[in-house]
């Protein structure tokens, strides 16, 4: 009995120690803060001007290391960046892409891109193996980043996030914004407040003044991070506005159906009450 009690106390102390350790880890590893996004909530939509600025940041900064596996013509999306057909044609033609089929001599060759082509990988890293050999690990595909980097907000926030008129799902955008603004230790370009362990392989990619916005928006890190996070959210989920419209229609249908069933029940059973 004494041994059993001793073992129980030892286990309890160990569990308490682990709880304290985890609490300390959580305290040292803050979660990204919830940001305000035009596309969050039941009625959220993408801000076209913001997506165009975000694409500019991707093109001038992020594309040096990260691929973006979407076709050029996706940029014509009226619910997305909304570029014109001519703009997309000119953009695609400015890239050299590898042709799917060899020429008459059996040689693989490159040609100017067309709107139907996907964005090519960075010139320095034509494939994941080359990127991994140079960097130690292949940088993630930016078309998947916002979805892949979603995180749990914990209790009680996940309850509020699930409310019908909130439906907050933009944790991936929050994460991207947090990482880009988390390089807060002077003199250490690989220390990030929000990255697990605070050591990140990617040196700080962007600072104030790195990109001159075409629309005159202030060239500040906060704007860069917010705009590219919005663009990458669209790249990960371009059908978001349409999905939200469908969800709203379903909710309205269910409310009307519930009302009809309620009044039908009252009419059918009125003589028995």
Model-predicted regions and their roles:
Residues 1-10:
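Bacterial N-terminal signal peptides that target proteins for export
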Residues 18-23:
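Sec/Tat signal peptide C-region and signal peptidase I cleavage site
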Residues 29-56, 67-85, 216-218, 225, ...:
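Electrostatic cytochrome c docking/interface patches
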Residues 41, 71-72, 85-118:
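Acidic/histidine-rich catalytic neighborhood
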Residues 56-67, 117-125, 138-147, 178, ...:
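C-type cytochrome heme c attachment motif
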Residues 137-188:
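Acidic, glycine-rich loop-and-strand cores that form catalytic or ligand-binding grooves
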Residues 194-196, 200-237:
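Extended, hydrophilic extramembrane loops/domains of integral membrane proteins
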Residues 243-248, 252-273:
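Juxtamembrane interface at the cytosolic side of transmembrane helices
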């Amino acid at each position: 009995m004494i041994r059993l009690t001793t073992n129980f106390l030892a286990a309890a102390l160990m569990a308490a120690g682990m709880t304290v350790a985890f609490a300390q880890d959580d305290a040292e590893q803050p979660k990204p803060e919830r940001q305000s996004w035009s596309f969050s909530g039941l009625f959220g939509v993408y801000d076209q001007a913001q997506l165009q600025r975000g694409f500019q940041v991707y093109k001038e900064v992020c594309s040096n290391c990260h691929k973006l596996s979407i076709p050029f013509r996706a940029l014509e999306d009226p619910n997305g960046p909304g570029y014109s057909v001519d703009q997309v044609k000119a953009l695609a033609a400015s890239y050299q892409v590898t042709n799917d089929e060899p020429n008459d001599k059996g040689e693989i060759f490159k040609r100017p891109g067309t709107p139907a082509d996907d964005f090519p990988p960075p010139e320095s890293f034509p494939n994941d193996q080359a990127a991994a050999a140079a960097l130690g690990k292949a940088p993630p595909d930016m078309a998947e980043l916002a979805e892949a980097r979603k995180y749990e907000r914990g209790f009680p926030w996940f309850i509020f996030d699930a409310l019908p008129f909130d439906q907050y799902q933009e944790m991936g955008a929050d994460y991207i914004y947090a990482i880009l603004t988390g390089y807060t230790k002077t003199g250490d370009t690989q220390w990030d407040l929000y990255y697990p362990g605070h050591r990140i392989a990617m040196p700080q990619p962007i600072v104030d003044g790195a990109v001159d916005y075409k629309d005159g928006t202030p060239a500040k890190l906060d704007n860069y991070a917010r705009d590219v996070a919005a663009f990458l959210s669209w790249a990960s989920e371009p059908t978001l506005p349409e999905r939200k419209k469908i969800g709203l229609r379903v909710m309205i249908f269910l409310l009307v159906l519930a009302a009809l069933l309620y009044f039908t029940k009252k009419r059918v059973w009125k003589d028995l009450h």
